[in-house]
Amino acid sequence: MSPVLGEFEQRILFTLIRLGSDVHGVAIRNHLEESGRAVSPGALYTALDRLEKRGFVTSRLGEPTPDRGGKRKRLYTLQPSGERAVARLYESLRSMTQGLGTRLRKLEG
């Protein structure tokens, strides 16, 4: 049985597929907001922590950078279990929406 993921967690996983490995939380947040999903930093990092505990993502501390005053960024990477979850979600959405374009065009007139 596939694990249940909330809409926000799904969006985070889709974002990580798009952005690749070693992605900083700010980049994830920016991508989510560009795609129309406003998100607070607290909500994002709480969801990332949940996804990490479930084994879908891992995080590591990057190197200190001068632009951050020597602080290190936490970087996130999608794991194979997260990739499989995205593949299942994608297939489910594709199956559910098959033929929907034709129906919607008819409704538009």
Model regions: which residues?
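Short secondary-structure boundary/capping segments
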Residues: 4, 49, 66-68
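Short, well-ordered turn and helix-capping elements at secondary-structure junctions
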Residues: 32, 61-63, 80-82
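Amphipathic alpha-helical dimerization/coiled-coil segments
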Residues: 81-109
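Exposed loop/turn and edge beta-strand positions of beta-sandwich/beta-sheet ligand-binding modules
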Residues: 72
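N-terminal helix-turn-helix DNA-binding core of bacterial DNA-binding proteins
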Residues: 2-43
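Basic amphipathic alpha-helical segments that dock to polyanions
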Residues: 44-46, 50-51
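Alpha-helical residues within the helix-turn-helix
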Residues: 30, 52-53
